[in-house]
């Protein structure tokens, strides 16, 4: 008997010695494997060892496991109380990995675990010869599954670093693909391009992965990432499992140009493709758009396209798209917004006597710049051009010298661009003075009556001046009564020896009314243009100093200081400003429940092609922020924080070409002035500094020119803004004039161009600059301006006022005079003396 068991024991040792593991190489070492086979049931080794041990170590007279066979999953134990041999469920099985499925649907690491479970559950569990249980159950949660895959990548990465001598801190995304390629090559032991369950089993055994992966195993790769459910993993499925993204972008689509017409909707489609492409991220001016909940860019679509629901000029510019996490593959969309032409002609009608000169002008704006043409009575005038009939300023002006009766007609200006066509008619009547027609009468009344006048508010009341002949049309004295009231225009103050007026700011309301602030009387006067009389006084908060007419909403905004020391500044609004109704002010909603911190406000001015402005900004004293307001509801919307840029805003300018705000910042404690900030109105985000440009910004009416004035440096910088919203450097002008104010005037020699005139706060000259060429000229000897202490209402102690879209005249005051400049000839037209402190000037008229 003993010999028999000795033989069995020796055979057991031989069997154990023969069951070893294949030699591992560095990292994953398995190069081949034996296919997984199903073995017949036999007594587990741990149970055999127990029986042998019981035989070799006799346990006394009461019980022995020598002849006790307990069956699979159980072993023999001696009951400590009865000292008899009994069968009990095995405490544990020998660690080895040979996974099988039980008939109870559970997954087991080996046969022994099946039998042990049957014993513990007291039910019959057989081995099922398929792998269905490998893919059932939900013990492997998503977070654990992700951790398992990360661990596999880390293991492979260690080998990759060792073998390839790579830097472990290099880009994870770029390194992931070779790691997964190597891992798949190792898993695919038979190199057939597919990984099956047997190969996964061998990897688990080889790497002892079953000890480290908690509730997840390699079989979960087949469970969750076998995309076509063929119970094999191909390389593409491996890429999917480990999120190896292979993206492609055709070379000819790296830059895409898209054009849309204002008012339409637009779709920008990202051409980046690839299996498992992550969500597409869109940026504008390096600001991510996807999570901003924008009103007009609010649906990115399942395909990652960018949708703009209603295109405006603010949307023009560059947009970039890329797959999330893969910013190195990006597409740039150059988005151009086309705007149909909008035309204005001047004059609408005119009468001329034979032998004089007539001029018909046409101004057109659109994107791109429109091409102009002229018809006379419906027939193209180009074939009829001569010395007597010429086109000037790139076709924007018809010039007729020595007019004849046959020149009478309807002259139609036509503007065309890619987005559309517009036209308008300017009528010319050639008649001698003896045949005065109704058209002639109407034209003369329009030209010499209430329109095309400068209104000057000065110490001795209000003067209405016709600029061509420098004639007074009306003088409203301080003692004149308001129409229908007993109040005087400027009541005599007790401390004044003579009755005089104090004015601050004034605005033109649709050429119908002029609103003008009287800061020492805490009120606004309304001047009726038709009757040239003061018709109403509107009470305001103390010391109203700044007015702005919001044409989009027919509102006049009023900034009052509260006192000369600016102790309690407030904002008020007069609604229905152009209506023939009694007017009053209403307060705006306080920002942060604080009325007394308002230092200034900014509302963009509408243009010929952009007629509606929806938002404005409030500036608080010494605060690094812009407070956005809804002009329609007069309520606060949000705050744009400028602290990170260390900018306390002083003044703003706006261009509709790309929708940029340019912000000049207050000098810091060292006296250094930070560069201008640029804010994108689409996202309300700071997109950076405007290069190294500093100073007060001004933007031309067409939005194309940004002129920045830095008095400290004596520098005027001109930048050009393209129809794609690009900001380009143009030229610099060095001057010691100390610019007080700027006025833009359309060029008389070039269509679609502007000139600027700059008045001086200290000197007697006016600066002229032709923006298209950089040509500079000085108009000299305009006498000294008001002293700054005599004009406390703003920093512009010498105002300069243009005369509208077609006007050739500008007005600027000195201390005791008015100067009218001829912008067409770039020279002084006339001086009007005995006008003291006439620094409040308004133009009324179409010209």
UniProtKB/Swiss-Prot annotation:
Alphabetized UniProt keyword annotations: Calcium, Disulfide bond, Glycoprotein, Immunoglobulin domain, Metal-binding, Repeat, Secreted, Signal
Residues of the signal peptide: 1-20
Domain of life: Eukaryota
Ig-like domain segment(s): 250-338, 341-426
Predominant location: secreted
Record-annotated EF-hand domain positions: 175-210, 211-246
Keyword Glycoprotein: yes
Entry binding sites for Ca(2+) 2: 226, 228, 230, 232, 237
Family matches, as InterPro entries: EF-hand-dom_pair, EF_Hand_1_Ca_BS, EF_hand_dom, Ig-like_dom, Ig-like_dom_sf, Ig-like_fold, Ig_sub, Ig_sub2
Localization per record: Secreted
Domain Kazal-like as annotated: residue spans: 81-135
Cysteine disulfide links: 87-119, 93-112, 101-133, 270-321, 362-413
Glycan-linked positions: 318, 394
Metal-binding among keywords: yes
GO MF term set: calcium ion binding
Positions annotated to bind Ca(2+) 1: 188, 190, 192, 199
Family annotation (Gene3D superfamilies): 3.30.60.30, EF-hand (1.10.238.10), Immunoglobulins (2.60.40.10), YVTN repeat-like/Quinoprotein amine dehydrogenase (2.130.10.10)
UniProt xrefs under SMART domains: IG, IGc2, KAZAL
CC annotations in GO: extracellular region
Protein name: Follistatin-related protein 5
Organism field: Mus musculus (Mouse)
Gene name as annotated: Fstl5
């Amino acid at each position: 008997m003993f010999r028999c068991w000795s033989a069995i024991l020796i055979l057991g040792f031989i069997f154990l010695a023969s069951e070893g593991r294949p030699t591992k190489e560095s990292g994953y070492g398995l190069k081949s494997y034996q296919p997984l086979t199903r073995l017949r049931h036999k007594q587990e080794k741990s149970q055999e060892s127990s029986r042998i041990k019981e035989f070799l170590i006799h346990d006394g007279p009461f019980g022995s496991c020598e002849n006790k066979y307990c069956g699979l999953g159980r072993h023999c134990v001696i009951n400590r109380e009865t000292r008899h041999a009994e069968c009990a469920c095995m405490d544990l099985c020998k660690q080895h990995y040979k996974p099988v499925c039980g008939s109870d649907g559970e997954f087991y690491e080996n046969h022994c675990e099946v039998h042990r479970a049957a014993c513990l559950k007291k039910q019959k569990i057989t081995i099922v010869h398929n792998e269905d249980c490998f893919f059932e159950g939900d013990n492997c949660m998503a977070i654990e599954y992700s951790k398992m895959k990360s661990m596999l990548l880390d293991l492979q990465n260690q080998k990759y670093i060792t073998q390839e001598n790579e830097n472990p801190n290099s880009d994870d995304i770029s390194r992931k693909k070779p790691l997964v390629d190597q891992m798949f090559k190792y898993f695919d032991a038979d190199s057939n391009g597919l990984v099956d369950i047997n190969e996964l089993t061998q990897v688990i055994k080889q790497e002892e992965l079953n000890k480290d992966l908690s509730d997840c195993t390699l079989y979960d790769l087949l469970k969750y990432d076998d995309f076509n459910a063929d119970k094999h993993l191909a390389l593409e499925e491996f890429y999917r499992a480990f999120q190896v993204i292979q993206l492609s972008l055709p070379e000819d689509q790296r830059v895409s140009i898209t054009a849309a017409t204002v008012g339409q909707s637009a779709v920008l489609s990202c051409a980046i493709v690839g299996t498992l492409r992550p969500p597409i991220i869109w940026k504008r001016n390096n600001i991510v758009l996807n999570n901003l909940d924008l009103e007009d860019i609010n649906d990115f679509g399942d395909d990652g396209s960018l949708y703009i629901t209603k295109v405006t000029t603010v949307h023009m510019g560059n947009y970039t798209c890329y797959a999330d996490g893969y910013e190195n593959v990006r597409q740039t969309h150059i988005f151009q917004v086309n705007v149909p032409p909008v035309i204005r002609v001047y004059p609408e009608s005119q009468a001329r006597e034979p032998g004089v000169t007539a001029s018909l002008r046409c101004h057109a704006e659109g994107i791109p710049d429109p091409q102009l043409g002229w018809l006379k009575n419906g027939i193209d005038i180009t074939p009829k051009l001569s010395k007597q009939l010429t086109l000037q300023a790139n076709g924007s002006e018809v010039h007729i010298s020595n007019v004849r009766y046959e020149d009478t007609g309807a002259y139609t200006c036509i503007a065309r661009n890619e987005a559309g066509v517009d036209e308008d008619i300017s009528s010319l009547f050639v008649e001698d003075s003896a045949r005065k027609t109704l058209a002639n009468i109407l034209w003369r009344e329009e030209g010499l009556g209430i329109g095309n006048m400068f209104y000057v508010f000065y110490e001795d009341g209000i003067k209405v001046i016709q600029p061509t002949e420098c004639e007074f049309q009306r003088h409203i004295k301080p003692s004149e009564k308001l129409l229908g009231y007993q109040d005087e225009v400027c009541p005599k103050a007790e401390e004044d020896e003579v009755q005089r007026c104090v004015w601050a700011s004034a605005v033109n309301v649709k050429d119908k009314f002029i609103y003008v602030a009287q800061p020492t009387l805490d009120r606004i006067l309304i001047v009726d243009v038709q009757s040239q009389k003061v018709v109403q006084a509107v009470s305001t908060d103390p010391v109203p100093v700044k007015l702005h007419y919001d044409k989009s909403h027919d509102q006049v905004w009023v900034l009052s200081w509260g006192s000369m020391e600016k102790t309690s500044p407030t904002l008020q609004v007069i609604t229905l400003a152009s209506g023939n109704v009694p007017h009053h002010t209403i307060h705006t909603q306080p920002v942060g429940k604080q009325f007394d911190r308002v230092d200034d406000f900014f509302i963009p001015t509408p243009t010929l092609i952009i007629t509606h402005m929806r938002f404005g900004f409030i500036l608080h004293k010494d605060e690094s922020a812009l407070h956005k307001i809804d002009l329609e509801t007069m309520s606060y919307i949000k705050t744009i924080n400028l602290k990170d840029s260390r900018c306390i805003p002083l003044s703003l300018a706006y261009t509709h070409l790309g929708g940029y705000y340019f912000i000049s910042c207050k000098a810091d404690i060292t006296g250094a002035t930070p560069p201008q900030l640029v804010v994108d109105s689409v996202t309300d985000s700071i997109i950076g500094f405007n290069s190294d440009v500093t100073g007060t910004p001004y933007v031309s009416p067409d939005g194309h020119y940004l002129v920045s004035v830095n008095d400290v440096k004596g520098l005027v910088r001109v930048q050009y803004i393209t129809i794609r919203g690009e900001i380009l450097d143009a030229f610099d002008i060095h001057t010691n004039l100390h610019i007080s104010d700027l006025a833009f005037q359309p060029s008389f020699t070039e269509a679609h161009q502007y000139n600027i005139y700059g008045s001086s706060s200290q000197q007697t000259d006016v600066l002229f600059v032709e923006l298209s060429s950089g040509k500079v000229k000085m108009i000299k000897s305009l006498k000294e301006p008001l002293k700054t202490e005599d004009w406390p209402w703003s920093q512009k102690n010498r105002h300069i006022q243009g005369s509208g879209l077609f006007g050739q005249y500008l007005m600027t005051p000195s201390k005791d005079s008015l100067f009218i400049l001829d912008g067409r000839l770039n020279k002084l037209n006339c001086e009007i003396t005995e006008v003291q402190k006439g620094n409040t000037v308004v133009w009324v008229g179409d010209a």
